Amino acid sequence: MATIKEIADLAGVSRGTVDRVLNKRGSVNPQTAQKIMEIVHALDYKPNRAGLVLAAQKKNLRLGVILFGEGNPFFDEVTDGIRQKEEDLACYNCTVQIKRVNVDTLEQLQAIDEFVKEGINGIAISPTNDPRLARRIDELFEQGIPVVALNTDIKNCKRIAFVGSNYYQSGATAAGLMRLMAKNESTKIGIVTGSEEILCHTERIAGFTNAIQSYPNIDIVATITNDDDDFVSYDQTTQLLKEHPELSLIHISEPTRLR
């Protein structure tokens, strides 16, 4: 079985350079990186998983996850997935802590502070799109604590990755389905959305409304925001229907509220 040392010797570089290329971290000359990868493929190099486990076990990694509140069916399933993966990570001496908070920037900042005090090594968060949170994520990056945005993104910060959907496109797709249901007839629609603080909600609405504008027979007569609250959503939607009996269709941009 080929080793990193053998690859380094054949490429005429250090083992550290090979490690950076294999793990895609740090800056390596593109020609050198290509040469290393050609050697890797030629030798059919496979990482020593036993060695990785032993190395990881010395680190005692702690990961933190911040999700939106209890009782949200979508995030209940996300939590189940995290717990399932946590079992796989146990052999790497990695533990995962989950905090559930409301759609509130201050609560998210408090959860981050608690994680930092507990010595967390990395954080995944479903963030509000708030400059205060963006600045805190930048601070974490400078401290060597990487942050991944989960399900909804945040603008203008140093989060290292976003795991989620193209919400603008999903909104546009919903508009296309509305057009099919309207059957080219004059149609009045209402919009129910969650929170203006959550980027995936605002992106869905932007994609939806921009696409609807190209369908001249469809008019948006009202948009309501339920602050991600079931009871508020019920009351406001009921009021919407009373005030606008001409509505034919309602677009609910946050389907987790339907239970």
Which functions belong to the PLM regions below?
Residues 163-187, 233-234:
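Hydrophobic alpha-helical segments within soluble ligand-binding/sensing domains
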